[in-house]
Curated annotation (Swiss-Prot):
Recorded family membership: Belongs to the CobT family.
Reaction(s) the record says it catalyses: 5,6-dimethylbenzimidazole + nicotinate beta-D-ribonucleotide = alpha-ribazole 5'-phosphate + nicotinate + H(+)
Active site: E318
Disulfide linkage: none
Protein name: Nicotinate-nucleotide--dimethylbenzimidazole phosphoribosyltransferase
Lineage: Bacteria, Pseudomonadati, Thermodesulfobacteriota, Desulfuromonadia, Geobacterales
Amino acid sequence: MTLLTEALSKICPVDAELMAQAQARLDNKTKPIGSLGRLEEFARRMVAITGSVAPDTKKKVVFTFAGDHGVTDEGVSAFPREVTPQMVYNFLRGGAGINVLARHVGAQVRVVDIGVDHDFGDTPGLIVRKVARGTRNFARGPAMTREEAVAALEVGIDLANEAKREGIALVGTGEMGIGNTTPSAAIIAAFSGLPVPAVTHRGTGIGDEALANKVRVIEAGLALNQPDPKDPIDVLAKVGGLEIAGIAGLILGCAANRLPVVVDGFISTAGALVACELNPHVRDYLFAAHQSVEVGHRVMLDRIGAAPILDLQLRLGEGTGGALAMGLIEAGVRILTEMATFEEAGVAEGDY
């Protein structure tokens, strides 16, 4: 049995009875029923995912996967490919947005080279799981072989298994890869069948002419490669990215290990979408961190049935929205575990 087939076989629905029990406890806290809104949702879902009446949230990790994209040859990004390794070094020095926000919520950042077109040597702190030096240009042929896509999925699964063994309590997804909104838009277009312009946006801030070119490139890639929406690995291999595959695998591994996973923005949700298409029960283990300004993100979230926690007009990626959302999920759990009941506080209950 391969890592992928094993993970897929272990993913099952969360326990609805546990969720109901958690809500009953929340309803007995010193507050009107339901008055803490989605914080209560986060708490009861954490109970159902972990199987614990007092879920642990102390050890939090954001995995930021880095990979390059051959489709950048088509002029789809405002930034050159060299920025990908430069940003990896920035992550490792602790100077990027994700580093700042992860520190703010007490999370660790782990940077994974899954497909950067650069030799990092023995760079301290970098997790090197390179499947290839970037994808190929999907406007000219498949981005990856099927074998490469599966290998990248299994990198993510392996990292999730390691996280479980370490006692990590809450996992976040992040990414870095110049041009990666292009494969992300291609993935949701392939699965949804929507016109490419309806799911494609400006990414790093490209202008109207570059956006029109980006749409044409995605349309050409889909027409050439004909990804099969009934075969998620085929979609991933033909128009996806290595970091997207790594994120999809991480999410599958987390679901298989009953680890809650906080999904960042557009690119991370492309990975979550692939994971959910492979096994629909995956969605039970996901928290959608935020609503990105990328137009295709809403389509992705609707398809996987996820309600975003935040809407802050974010479009950076890296795991930044996920880090922020971790703090709110942890707050919900603390309401469940630390807030007094009416009986404990000696407060009269309301008559509902």
